[in-house]
Amino acid sequence: MVTSTPHVSRDNSILIFDSGAGGLSILREVRKKLPVTRFHYLMDTACFLYGNQSDSLLERRIPELCKAAVERFDPAVLVLACNTASTLALPLLREVLDIPVVGVVPA
């Protein structure tokens, strides 16, 4: 019998991505629930203020940054702590990454 197992990270860490420092509040709350978990925080300071950038630029940039960070840090989960990133890149990242990707979007 062949069974499929989910991606298991070497350090079982969580990668949190935001365009700036706003996602630090999400990091703080997740850390309260998972105090022994290792976290990586990825902030896109080169294109900060996503509202001033074109969707086409961000649709290319966000997946590139996140994929590179996943390859480098090998997290168990990617959290997009940015509404714009979640709206523009969440479906694509779920397709191309072999780890769960969680986004934040307005209700």
Sequence positions of predicted segments:
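Non-catalytic structural scaffold of enzyme domains
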Residues: 2-107
